UniProtKB/Swiss-Prot annotation:
Endonuclease that specifically degrades the RNA of RNA-DNA hybrids. Its EC number is 3.1.26.4. It catalyses: Endonucleolytic cleavage to 5'-phosphomonoester. It comes from the Bacteria. Gene3D superfamilies: Ribonuclease H-like superfamily/Ribonuclease H. A divalent metal cation binds at residues 22-23, 118. It comes from Prochlorococcus marinus (strain MIT 9215). Residues 16-205 form the RNase H type-2 domain. Its main location: cytoplasm. This is Ribonuclease HII. Keywords: Cytoplasm, Endonuclease, Hydrolase, Manganese, Metal-binding, Nuclease.
Length: 205
């Protein structure tokens, strides 16, 4: 009887309990928008929480980098997707964000039965059950994990792009519209990776 209970407990702990998805870079003025989806069992949710997984915005860059390989190792599956600057400018940021999420989901080996999405907006192209959770990255380990993976993936790309776009301090602002970044655009001009649709609002394009 005891063995049966232990077996049932192990099965419960190893069963997929959460599939969370989040985006990063939606509000940036430079570079693509990234999304990540992470599939977790009950057991590995607990382990990741013990390792310090939480809302990526509350973690240092060093801690996020430390956690990514742990998340990828402990996830049952994961996917990363992105949408280009051209897609953002042509389709609008909402559609482009949805597209990056769908691309991340297509990387999964199996379609999840339920998806937990960070934020209030429905993922319209998704044909399946979804729950939208405001501030989900502070409430669900799967969303927090997805947020960290997406954030580090995008930040790594920004560091690589710094070599080609050295006049904009991309390594520092990560493509976001800081006062310093906007000042450098006025000085050096708009590049092919700046979001023209965003810069029009600032009268910079």
């Amino acid at each position: 009887m005891q063995e049966k209970k232990e077996e049932d407990l192990q099965q419960a702990l190893n069963k997929v309990s959460e599939v969370g998805i989040d985006e990063v870079g939606r509000g940036a003025i430079f570079g693509p928008v990234f999304s990540a989806v992470v599939v977790l069992t009950e057991k590995n949710k607990f382990l990741l929480k013990q390792l310090g997984v939480k809302d990526s915005k509350k973690l240092t860059p060093k801690k996020r980098k430390f956690l990514v390989p742990k998340i990828l190792l402990l996830s049952s599956d994961y996917g990363i997707g992105q949408s280009s600057v051209r897609e953002i400018d042509n389709l609008g940021i909402r559609v482009a964000t949805e597209l990056s999420m769908i691309r991340a989901l297509k990387k999964l080996k199996e379609k999840p039965s339920e998806l937990i999405v960070d934020g209030p907006l429905l993922l319209r192209p998704w044909r399946g059950t979804q729950k939208n959770i405001v501030s989900g990255d502070s409430k669900f380990i799967s969303i927090a994990s997805a947020s960290i993976v997406a954030k580090v993936s995008r930040d790594n790309l920004m560091m690589k792009l710094e070599k080609k776009y050295s006049g904009y301090l991309i390594f520092k602002n990560k493509g976001y519209g800081t006062r310093e970044h906007l000042s450098l655009i006025k000085k050096n001009g708009v590049t092919n990776l700046h979001r023209k649709s965003f810069l029009k609002k600032s009268n910079l394009f």
